[in-house]
Amino acid sequence: MTDKIVVAALYKFVSLPDYQALREPLLQTLLDNGIKGTLLLAEEGINGTVSGSRAAIDALLAWFRQDARLADIDHKESYCDEQPFYRTKVKLKKEIVTLGVPGVDPNQRVGTYVEPQDWNALISDPEVLLIDTRNDYEVAIGTFEGAIDPKTKSFREFPEYVKAHFDPSKHKKVAMFCTGGIRCEKASSYMLGEGFEEVYHLKGGILKYLEEVPQEQTKWRGDCFVFDNRVTVRHDLSEGDYDQCHACRNPISVEDRQSEYYSPGVSCPHCWDSLPEKTRESARERQKQIELARARNQPHPIGRDPRQLNEA
């Protein structure tokens, strides 16, 4: 395993009034150790996924341990053969995961953490309302048995869905989950603020569950979407068979790639009839540069991802 790239998903909700001052030393630590990926800093904490050698990730964790506030940062590891990120970034944000509701602060109030080994028993309770807090394209390729899919396009839509579909007086027990634990932790803080009394969330998220719960005992079905070039991981955390459309961000299956509407890097069956021409042209140009760099055995070209045109 020593020659594998270590992919570390990490976050912690913690008060960081000096978060702006942390950016440069954190970025320098990443660069000094050849670590790729993106970390977000905000007054409410830190969040992100990075990758590098075993020694590099250990050096980053050692850097966090120098600050008592970050010493016990939650992190989950998986492995891959190739670097899943192209860039190294540390960004300053208002929120480390954007819910968009003022006053929601997991540093002040949060639901009950549930360890992966206790999760199956909880969600088997018929009185428990099980909610997947991820986006629709993530849920489409894998989720837990019996989970409700809010069909959200972004986490910002989650509060509206809750208000429209759930009632604290009727739904006494709520359990939520997400990829690495951060969205469901923040969602639990929001739900408590809305008057829901028993709110639970999966500690470490789906990734920790897949790491710790034996496959023969799993209640997980499908693959888990991840926010890097692996696109998805299986129950053993190995890379899945999905690719990702660079135009709409949807995961695309082997069957999708056989479609007449699939054009590598440009469009897929999910978006071919809805993409603005500006986005399509940007995607074509980006794909051309990628193929040219590949033919010359050069690094992936650094440029704006056309997906971001729809993410303003």
UniProtKB/Swiss-Prot annotation:
Active site (record annotation): 178
Similarity section: Belongs to the TrhO family.
Domain Rhodanese: 124-218
Domain of life: Bacteria
Region spans: Disordered: 279-312
Chain intervals with Basic and acidic residues compositional bias: 279-294, 302-312
Gene Ontology terms: biological process: tRNA modification
Functional description taken from the UniProt entry: Catalyzes oxygen-dependent 5-hydroxyuridine (ho5U) modification at position 34 in tRNAs.
A Pfam family hit: Rhodanese
Protein name: tRNA uridine(34) hydroxylase
Reaction catalysis annotation: uridine(34) in tRNA + AH2 + O2 = 5-hydroxyuridine(34) in tRNA + A + H2O
HAMAP family: TrhO (MF_00469)
PANTHER family linked to this entry: RHODANESE-LIKE DOMAIN-CONTAINING PROTEIN 7-RELATED, THIOSULFATE SULFURTRANSFERASE/RHODANESE-LIKE DOMAIN-CONTAINING PROTEIN 2
One example GO MF annotation: oxidoreductase activity, acting on paired donors, with incorporation or reduction of molecular oxygen
Gene of this entry: trhO
Record carries keyword Oxidoreductase: yes
InterPro entries xref list: Rhodanese-like_dom, Rhodanese-like_dom_sf, TrhO, TRHO_N
The enzyme's E.C. designation: 1.14.-.-
